[in-house]
């Protein structure tokens, strides 16, 4: 059980770390209760990927996905992952020893929702059924920089105008496609002068959906639209992939047990997909994994105003206690082994 220790710059106090504290608090609350399995509390590093540009480094180690390329990745100060590990007094050559053993039964993660759904429903806890897949890409639009005062509108090859039209198309498609979210979170126009038509634009796209098929279809459509808009405006559109993360279903058996534990804690279970990535999706490659969400007041996360309700934390602890009790009595659960 656990979550991640890191977060993003200018963030709140509960993303990730609350799951670690809840896991530790749950173990403490057992107060001598004997279980037929051990519990390890995990605090993962680099879930967000802020420092090295690669998320889930800590949990990747448990599933054997830390290779030489990743170890060679450098942060903004030129420090590699390998060097950072050594600076913490650890040996990067022994990462393979962190791999999950065959007797590990499951991974369970408490996490704030980081969105407004549970609050809108008036529910303290959510049962996560899946973690959405996501693609991240960088698009470039290349036109012709020129004088803003002397170039007629019909003779322009304005890269920023092309990018702006495409960004509007991104929003439109996401609004028309159920449960799809698409975000252009970064735009850079060059040369960036008030009296110069933009000749080059870079823009990022983050697109997410619980269905890989739906997400891929939407992405293909947005690429076609970028090409079409660019061609009509005399601009060249290109793109490169930054990240592909497939959707991950949570373990059905664990999800059912969590639902019953939520009910036992006198809460109404709400089944939902996670729009954000989590360490649970990495561990799910090897072992059954499941997540429990806590309501996020205002739906605000990755911001200093991020918060939780203390009563919701108490309900999460109660739910966790009921869950462990159920799992301890389940022969189906105790008979499981780590997936190869």
Feature-to-residue mapping (PLM):
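Midchain, well-structured core segments that form catalytic/ion-binding scaffolds
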Residues: 6, 46-47, 51-213
């Amino acid at each position: 059980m656990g979550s991640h220790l890191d977060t993003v710059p200018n963030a709140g106090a509960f993303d990730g770390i609350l799951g670690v504290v809840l896991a530790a608090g749950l173990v403490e609350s057992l107060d001598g209760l004997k279980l037929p399995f051990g519990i390890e509390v995990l605090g993962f590093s680099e879930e967000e990927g802020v420092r090295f540009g690669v998320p889930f480094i800590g949990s990747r180690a448990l599933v054997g996905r830390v290779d030489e390329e990743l170890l060679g990745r450098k942060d903004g100060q030129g420090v590699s992952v390998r060097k950072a590990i050594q600076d913490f007094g650890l040996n990067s050559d022994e990462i393979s020893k962190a791999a999950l053993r065959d007797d590990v039964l499951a991974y369970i993660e408490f996490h704030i929702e980081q969105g407004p759904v549970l609050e809108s429903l008036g529910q303290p806890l959510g049962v996560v059924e899946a973690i959405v897949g996501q693609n991240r890409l960088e698009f470039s639009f290349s036109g012709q920089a020129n004088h803003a005062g002397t170039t007629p509108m019909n003779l322009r090859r304005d890269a920023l105008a092309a990018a702006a039209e495409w960004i509007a198309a991104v929003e439109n498609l996401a609004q028309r496609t159920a449960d799809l979210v698409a975000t252009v979170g970064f735009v850079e126009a060059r040369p960036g002068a008030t009296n110069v038509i933009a000749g080059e634009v870079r823009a990022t796209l983050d697109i997410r959906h619980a269905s890989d098929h739906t997400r891929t279809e939407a992405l293909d459509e947005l690429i076609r639209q970028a090409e079409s808009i660019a061609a009509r405006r005399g601009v060249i559109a290109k793109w490169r992939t930054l990240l592909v993360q497939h959707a991950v279903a949570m373990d059905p058996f664990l999800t059912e047990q969590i639902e019953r534990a939520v009910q036992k804690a006198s809460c109404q279970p709400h089944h939902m997909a996670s729009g954000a990535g989590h360490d649970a999706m990495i561990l799910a490659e090897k072992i059954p994994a499941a997540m429990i969400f806590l309501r996020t007041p205002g739906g605000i996360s990755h911001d200093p105003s991020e918060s939780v309700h203390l009563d919701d934390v108490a309900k999460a602890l109660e739910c966790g206690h009921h869950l462990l009790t159920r799992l301890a009595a389940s022969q189906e659960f105790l008979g499981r082994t780590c997936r190869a």
